[in-house]
């Protein structure tokens, strides 16, 4: 038995916490994660960018990055010009995965050049979301929906 280092990100927060779990048994790991998440026993735990909840054998793992959320799925709406598209994602999905889906959407009719410039922003804001961040980071606590705007604005020069 070896220690497992777990990076825990809780829905609606911008930072994560590291916890060292002295067991690689799934039940012990989930209990430690849920304690950090402070969302109770009904909290769902996902490995980063995974669609399914954390399960299986962790014995051979030395580190793990997880997302803790009250949501099993997040209903994501992406708006572009006067159109909107919707899809359910795991709370552990990254902004990059949502961006690839939205920019590649047939509804928005983006060519390859436009897809390369595309970014996601929160409505009413000006800064693009970090592509490696998870969608759970932008949730209002315990709400299982997220609205994002797709923009083609150039952010490379500030």
What residues fall within each predicted segment?
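Ubiquitin system architectures
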Residues: 1-158
């Amino acid at each position: 038995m070896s220690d497992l280092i777990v990076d825990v990100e809780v829905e609606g927060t911008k930072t994560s916490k590291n916890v060292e779990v002295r067991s690689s048994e799934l039940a012990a790991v989930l209990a430690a994660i849920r304690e950090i998440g402070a969302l109770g026993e009904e909290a769902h735990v996902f490995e980063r960018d995974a669609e399914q909840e954390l399960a299986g054998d962790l014995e051979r793992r030395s580190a793990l990055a997880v997302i803790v959320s009250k949501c099993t799925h997040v209903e994501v709406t992406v708006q572009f010009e006067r159109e909107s598209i919707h899809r359910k994602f795991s709370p552990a999905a990254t902004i990059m995965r949502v961006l690839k889906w939205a920019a590649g959407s047939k509804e928005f009719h983006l060519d390859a050049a436009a897809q390369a410039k595309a970014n996601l922003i929160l409505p009413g804001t000006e800064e693009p979301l970090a592509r490696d961040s998870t969608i759970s980071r932008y949730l209002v606590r315990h709400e299982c929906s997220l609205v994002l705007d797709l923009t083609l604005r150039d952010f490379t020069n500030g």
